[in-house]
Amino acid sequence: GAVTKHISSAHPYCPELRKIAIQVGKDLGITTHEKGTVVVIQGPRFSTVAESRWFSKMGWDVINMTQYPEVYLARELGICYANIALITDYDAGLEGRDDIEPVTEEAVLKVFAENNEKVKNMLFEVIKRIDLENSNCTCCNVDLSGLDL
């Protein structure tokens, strides 16, 4: 039968890439949050008010559709991976805040368009700062023995 491996995803993102991305964001004057907890929903769709309320009560900071399964697949293959989340909206709105509307596709696309250059510049700078020669990264130390790759 097929051989499977269980790879730890306790720390799914590469610590070295995260440090670089955080520093680049700060250096470029981009509002940068050094940590947070993301909840991944299956898209493409937006959350209901009930889901949004639950996510907030659970302490999750960001609702996202695109970090999983990519992060786990990268971990399985021993590939360094970090995520740069562009915050576009307040999901289904904020309770008690009539001035904040629930998300729309148009609003998300507008924020993406407004930040496209910032994200491109950030990615190019992150790539420039990756130092493969002096890396202490252990992402590639995944035991893939026994797998027919």
Role assignments for model-derived ranges:
Residues 101-103:
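Membrane-interfacial helix-loop-helix connectors in multipass membrane proteins
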Residues 1-95, 106-117, 122-130, 134-149:
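Glycine-rich phosphate- or other oxyanion-binding loops that anchor nucleotides, phosphorylated ligands
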